[in-house]
Amino acid sequence: MTQPAYIIGAYGYTAQLVAAKMAESNLEFIAVGRDQSNLAQVQQRFANCVGLIVADCQHAAEIDFVAKGALVVNCAGPFNLFAPELISRCVAVGAHYIDITGEQEIVRHSYEHHAALALQNEVCVVHSMAFESALTDLLISRALLKTDRKALTAVNSYYKLGSQQMSPGTKLTMKLANFAPNYIVQDQRLQPLLQQMAEVPQDLPFDAARIVPYPEVIFAFERLKPQRAASHFVLEPDSNLAFAGNFAKMGTNNSAQQEAIVQRFKNVQHVGPDAAARSAQDFELYVSLLCADKNYVEAIRGHNMYEITAALVVLAVQHFAAQPTHFGVLSPGQFLGQKGLDWLSNNPYFQFISLKSN
């Protein structure tokens, strides 16, 4: 891959962090979005922005710029609503696709509808190259090295987040969370998320957790076919995110209602956390793989979740530049492979927590 990547939604909060991180690595991009003036501001701000395209990526007629061999970095969520047409175009013409989604249904949809053609056309579709789900998937890859590939009984992730400051895109995604199905894995099948209270976690330094629907559950199902899998927020008195939202509802795919929510949201100015606030965003992440009677745990503690997302996207773009050799709909851990494991062990954002596995 020698041509610049397309950043979709380039004037969004996280997209601009990605653009800045790409500049640090001398990676060029073309800014894509619906608003000409906002795109012009991006091009003025970032010397590594080498072009702009005004397009609404929900409409097939406006995305014919995506051609064979291109790399599309999609930062325009909510992805359940805005990404399907773009993904279909990428897979059909032979363009690679990355996004930063934290939504399950668009990921499940790609596995069901695009996996075969993506493999045939030698395309990589990599969802959730972000703090949510990519870190968990990489930690799963690391834990798998210790399991001798034994059959997995359960795969669980637990987030303890010290701040509830969110980007505008994350806020909007949460408002639309129940317009699509949410999932856990139960009895080796994807099942609707109907109950958020979880079992008491074992071998972990907290007592309660609440299920929240992150894409890592879909990745775990597709990669490993465990008997059970779920993602969680830790429930502790000092956790600002103990409320965890209400996701235990059946999906109601009402496009008109979603569009109305999006429009109302856009009519209000939203500001994401500034650099100081991002740096102060502390977190802990625990990943548990239960094989027979042994529990393999990987855990990290760190800060700056949005910067982690930007760093992961750049890592993925660099990996594409080196020409991928595995194709299809891939989880972040599958796509990055050893490069991702090396990055886990050498980055400025987090450190491993030592825990005993039983």
Predicted regions and their residues:
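N-terminal Rossmann-fold cofactor-binding loop
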Residues: V32-Q36
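Short beta-strand element of Class I
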Residues: E28-I30
